[in-house]
Regions:
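A short helix-breaking turn/cap at a secondary-structure junction
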Residues: 59-144, 148, 167, 311-339
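Small-aliphatic-rich amphipathic alpha-helix that forms the alpha element of a beta-alpha
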Residues: 231-234, 262-285
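Glycine-aromatic micro-motifs
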Residues: 314-319, 324-473
């Protein structure tokens, strides 16, 4: 918000702040002056302005958009962000801008099959902070709107899981209270040498906080961050994404000018940790308070989960039915083609030893796979007990088969190669038609292997067959 050109005006109430350092870009989009605009997001400047201007703020995985040419704030954490009126527009711009830049030391190559937009899974798990950990800083309307957002995500297919938010908030405190302050200073040291008086007073206070910081503190900070990141890993094993308010509240310009550092920390409560923990995020509009000011929510997930966040974020925005920015326009029926690979997971149907609780299920768990749902195949399959006695064989026989019990597991795309290597003949992966008319990749058996094998289709599945054998002993 600090600028030699003055403070951009919040189009909903000029007495209130429009956001952070990229708020000019956000205001331009909200007012309909531009279809999209770029920002930078180190600690939340690509998301907070989105919330305050009723628009979308896409903060990609670190390194997917080049930061070459960007004046750094904290180079290892900086991201180029995208503001747009809709998630679809933001995803289209993201897709155009994606690419590795050998001249940016923090640029990262995107994984094979990666695209900016994915598909909404039938079911997905959404983490939310425990009720006692939700901070709205006295804003009861923001709290009410967040509860409504939780209900809307549940209606879209989200399974709501309360999580411990403590390691995320502890990591957030490191942005302005840890050794990363020294990196901020390093970014501008040469430019301000002997001329600190040229800095804005607030910026000068932030930079001065790193004066005399011992080198050992940098390593202590890195170790603390690694510890917190490991703690959050236990959370990510339970959920696909995290839902938080983009900010807990909003302030008047006069309030921020009176106490800039403290209120800035408050506004970053739900955003400051994302880049430190290498997470992807998208801020989407959520509702309007009684005073006419918008409030937003943020969907957050591990690195390279951007397509999943865009898909769910687009569905959430459409369900909300809010006008676009401050334009008064409604969301058009834009359809974005999902990437060919359903990043970050590939659904795999299993019918035998990989079922939950069965002998080989541990292989899936070791790869980080998660059970999505129990299903049945279309009534076009036969199931056989193979000669080794450890696995069944599923063979398609259109018009002469039956529906077979199966489970769909979401396997990380990055682990598919290792999973395929573990599958031995006569089994392989093919396409399985399901009872609901959809199709999914899954285990099939070569026809030669079932010659002379016992057919167990009448049992309806591998579990029932094994139970019958144990009961018969």
């Amino acid at each position: 918000m600090r600028s030699p050109y003055g403070v951009p005006r919040n189009p909903f109430d000029p007495a209130y702040i429009p956001g952070g350092s990229s708020s000019g870009s956000a205001v331009a989009v909200a007012a309909g002056l531009a279809s999209f605009a770029l920002g930078t997001d180190t600690a939340g400047s690509g998301r907070v302005p989105a919330a305050f201007n009723n628009i979308v703020g896409l903060k990609p995985t670190r390194g997917l958009l080049s930061t070459r040419g960007v004046v750094p704030a904290c180079h290892s954490l900086d991201c180029v962000s995208i503001f747009a009126l809709s998630v679809a527009d933001a995803a289209i711009v993201f897709d155009c801008a994606l690419g590795f830049d050998a001249e940016d030391p923090y640029s990262r190559r995107m994984p094979a099959g990666f695209g900016a937009f994915g598909a909404v899974p039938a079911r997905f798990s959404v983490g939310v902070p425990r009720p006692g950990q939700r901070e709205f800083f006295g804003n009861s309307e923001a709290a009410r709107l967040f509860e409504a957002a939780i209900a809307r995500l549940a209606a879209l297919g989200g399974d709501i899981v309360e999580i411990d938010f403590a390691p995320f908030s502890e990591a957030a405190a490191l942005v302005y209270g840890g050794p990363w302050l020294a990196e901020r200073r390093a970014a501008i040291d040469a430019a301000i040498a002997g001329r600190r008086e040229l800095l804005h007073p607030v910026t000068r206070r932030v930079v001065a906080a790193s004066d005399g910081l011992p080198a050992a503190e940098v390593f202590r900070g890195q170790e603390l961050l690694a510890t917190l990141a490991q703690e959050t890993e236990t959370v990510w094993r339970r959920i696909d994404m995290l839902l938080v308010p983009t900010t807990g509240t909003i302030y008047r310009i006069a309030e921020v000018e009176a106490d800039p550092l403290a209120l800035n920390a408050t506004l970053g409560h739900y955003t400051n940790f994302a880049n430190l923990l290498d997470l992807s995020a998208i801020a989407v509009p959520n509702g309007v308070q009684s005073n006419g000011l918008p409030a937003g929510v943020c969907l957050i997930a591990p690195a390279f989960h951007d397509p999943l966040l865009a898909a769910v974020g687009a569905a959430f925005q459409r369900q909300g039915g809010l006008p676009l920015g401050a334009t008064g326009a409604t969301l058009p029926p834009i359809e974005v083609t999902p990437a060919p690979v359903p990043y970050p997971y590939l659904p795999i149907a299993v019918v035998g030893a990989h079922l939950e609780g069965q002998k080989l299920n541990g292989e899936l768990l070791a790869l980080g796979a998660r059970l999505r749902r129990a299903v049945r195949t279309a009534p076009d399959y036969r199931l056989y007990a193979l000669a080794d006695g450890r696995r069944p064989g599923l063979v398609r026989d259109p018009g002469a088969g039956t529906a077979i019990e199966a489970e769909i597991w979401d396997v990380p795309v990055a682990a598919i190669g290792a999973f395929l290597a573990s599958v031995t003949p006569p089994l392989g992966l093919g396409t399985i038609a399901l009872e609901d008319g959809s199709a999914v990749s899954g285990f099939l058996c070569e026809a030669y292997a079932v010659e002379g094998a016992r057919e167990i289709s009448e049992f309806g599945g591998w579990r029932a067959w094994r139970s019958s054998r144990q009961e018969g002993r």
